């Protein structure tokens, strides 16, 4: 029984059937595929983890790649944004894009990437860095008005700009600054003594042109010192300024069509020729002078030219820019201030009371200027609430990072300072109120003249001029504009600067 149950064990060759062989091969193949699948799955998992890691790093790193702004959309975005700047003006377009996309916006001007900044920290970053001492604008446009690598305002030849800036700094500080108050007071009073040429048959006074006449006379006495026809020169300055803001960002094709820009080229040349004639008068004056106790701005430039330091064209452009700087900025600022005074009679009363208290019946002295604190707050609030120049244009000289955004070398920058001045730092940002300057305002929130290496070189003399002219004017007259003549109601343009549309009936007082 046991033998039947337990047969002897032996190994005998067995021929496997084809079906069995196929089954074994299939199992081996399936094992290989499973191994390959496992390897592929592991690789995919690793790649997925690496991708997540890269995304996490990208999310947490400070540099951002996408700046808010209009879409490129196959090149249509750059065309539309450029057309808006050309059509509505640089200032108006900048306000539009900041309002729509935020305080850091990317647009295009003439195909070039341009950032519009109104965030105070971003604006301050650009102002204080020498990386942004260059400006941008049409090369052919700047050549048309003589500003390409000449003068100081739009000169982007940094080495030459630094050289000529030294002449401006010397003229606008030191002895020149000390003489400013007396010259402003004398000029204002002499013009107020003879208002006949600026008064119409109804007794209405063209106050804006009065202020321009005063300012151009002050500029001549301080920096040029030759006889000139104020009204004739002001007409040429006005046409030059119109040309400046017209050609500044025009495309190159505009200048290849002579019939399009012929008028502007002629208007620019008229002022250049007038300034050349005034410089020649100055040379004759210097040649006949018995002694040279005081060398003004133009005299210093003439001697620099004679020593081979500056070209004749650069001397002409420097004098031209010194002469035009105030009539279309400071004079219009004063005009807006007078309108704001009449819209805020309580402020006018405070200023008049302060003048009576500080001057105490005396004529204005240098020692009085620092004591006119209410007047200074009024000037600052006027420059904040309704600035004439509410933006500045720069170009990046190297790669940089602004508020976490990568900025490439050559990027255009528009600092929308006027919009920045309406920030929540001020207690009443959207109202005209001296309360906004009740306490000290840090420079990063208030930049009427800029700061850093390319700040306005005449910012100190400008404050002296405004105080002196306002004191002289308010001591003798009260300005009463027509009812419709308010800062909010008068027609204005905002291209290169905010300027009233000069309709005589609306600007008379």
UniProtKB/Swiss-Prot annotation:
GO annotation, biological process: female germ-line sex determination; female gonad development; female sex determination; female sex differentiation; male germ-line sex determination; ovarian follicle development; regulation of estrogen biosynthetic process; response to estradiol
Binding site for heme: 456
UniProt KW Hydrolase keyword: no
Chief site of localization: membrane
Places the protein is found: Membrane
Membrane topology: Peripheral membrane protein
Keywords (A to Z) from UniProt: Heme, Iron, Membrane, Metal-binding, Monooxygenase, Oxidoreductase
The keyword Oxidoreductase belongs to this UniProt entry's keyword annotation: yes
CDD domains: CYP19A1
Class of this enzyme: oxidoreductase
InterPro entries named in the record: Cyt_P450, Cyt_P450_CS, Cyt_P450_E_grp-I, Cyt_P450_sf, Cytochrome_P450_Monoox
Gene Ontology, cellular component aspect: endoplasmic reticulum; membrane
Reaction equation(s) it catalyzes: testosterone + 3 reduced [NADPH--hemoprotein reductase] + 3 O2 = 17beta-estradiol + formate + 3 oxidized [NADPH--hemoprotein reductase] + 4 H2O + 4 H(+); androst-4-ene-3,17-dione + 3 reduced [NADPH--hemoprotein reductase] + 3 O2 = estrone + formate + 3 oxidized [NADPH--hemoprotein reductase] + 4 H2O + 4 H(+)
Pfam families for this protein: p450
Entry superkingdom: Eukaryota
GO molecular function, a single term: iron ion binding
Essential cofactor(s): heme
EC number: 1.14.14.14
Family from the record: Belongs to the cytochrome P450 family.
Function of the molecule: Catalyzes the formation of aromatic C18 estrogens from C19 androgens.
Protein name: Aromatase
